[in-house]
A protein has these predicted regions:
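Class I SAM-dependent methyltransferase SAM/SAH-binding core
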Residues: 179, 185-234
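A short acidic, Gly/Pro-enriched loop at the edge of an enzyme's catalytic core
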Residues: 236-245
């Protein structure tokens, strides 16, 4: 996957020119008047993909795909994000002040009713598995150097106190059920277990989970369950059980971050909370090899959009600037009550 996305062309930039409402409407209808472009929009429902990844999914040459992406971009149905030297495409966020917002939302709703062909679904699963294996392989090889690698980006003490202030300010009962995804060496996990009656640690790396288990044992705690697997596995056993789910500097290691929000929504009780501590979007591509990062942080709007699509409402957030140029964002989301 890494090689497949590293040599992509520049994104399509729409010229800053005056476009009449009639032209906007024509561009939108043109973009939607092609079955392949509708397939592309369907694939982009939950995730972002590089050009060569999309070529693989829809089985066409890059030159042909580039034409379709240009048409979709001109209609403002797709947008781009840069990941180092790579360009990823996603669905554009629809704003309320867009005069064609209702039409675009209706178009996306209609596209989402389309089935993904079996061949595409198989390629999609394979691609996501390859992304996951990149991250898993890194942590299998570097579990003992976790703190050292993480310290290249941020030292825990730079945000620990702010993080615990957020946790303590959530107003949760000590009887709360808490889930931490990707607990690393267990530093936050220990603090959560000291505060709450029931805590579950979820990680797809046995080596990392063993480090967390050792940290809990060293602190003499016995109220933590350990689950080897992904968030999709966790929702099978913990569906609707969690008062709080925490991602602490983990989302940028996850192959399908948007889908992960849907898993979290399934884990949470009604009115439950999601706390995300994550890097803001950056351009330091070296973290891929040095720290096992799949994504170069995230924009606030991306996290908010994925949360909203999963029935999670933004509650509060704050950013912390670090001396090395990275920024950390802390964002709290609440599950909508039915």
């Amino acid at each position: 996957v890494q090689a497949a996305v590293a040599t992509q062309s520049q994104p399509f930039l729409i010229a800053d020119e005056q476009v009449t409402p009639a032209q906007q409407l024509a561009q939108l209808h043109k973009a939607l008047a092609d079955a392949l472009r509708l397939q592309i929009l369907r694939l982009l429902k939950n995730e972002s993909f590089g050009v060569l990844e999309l070529c693989r999914l829809v089985a066409i040459r890059q030159s042909a795909l580039s034409h379709h992406l240009k048409v979709l971009a001109k209609a403002e149905l797709v947008a781009t994000r840069r990941e180092g030297n790579s360009i990823f495409y996603r669905r554009a966020f629809i704003t309320d002040d867009d005069p064609l917002a209702d039409l675009k939302r209706a178009a996306f709703d209609a596209v989402d009713t389309l089935d993904i062909p079996r061949e595409q679904a198989e390629q999609l699963n394979q691609l996501q598995q390859e992304r996951s294996e990149l991250s898993l392989s890194f942590f299998q090889k570097n579990a003992e150097r976790f703190s050292e690698n993480q310290g290249l980006i941020v030292e825990r003490e730079h945000y620990d106190s702010s993080l615990m202030d957020v946790v303590d300010g959530l107003g949760l009962s000590s009887a709360a059920c808490v889930v931490e995804i990707g607990p690393g060496e267990g530093r936050l996990l220990v603090e959560l277990a000291r505060r709450f009656a029931s805590v579950t640690a979820v990680d797809n790396s046995k080596d990392m989970l063993d480090l967390s288990r050792a940290a809990i044992a060293a602190d003499g705690l016995s109220n933590v369950e350990f689950l080897l697997g992904e968030t999709a596995n966790a929702r099978e056993t913990l569906s609707g059980a969690a008062d709080l789910v925490v991602f602490d500097m983990v989302l940028h290691h996850i192959a399908t971050p948007a889908s992960t929000f849907r898993d979290v929504a399934a884990l949470l009780k009604e009115d439950g909370l999601l706390l995300v501590i994550e890097l803001c979007s950056h351009d330091q591509d070296w973290v891929r090899n040095s720290c096992g990062d799949l994504w170069l942080g995230f924009d606030e709007s991306e996290l908010d959009q994925w949360a909203a699509m999963s029935g999670l409402r933004f509650e509060q957030g704050s950013n912390l600037a670090l001396r090395n140029g990275f920024q950390i964002q802390m964002r709290v989301f609440r599950k909508h009550a039915n």
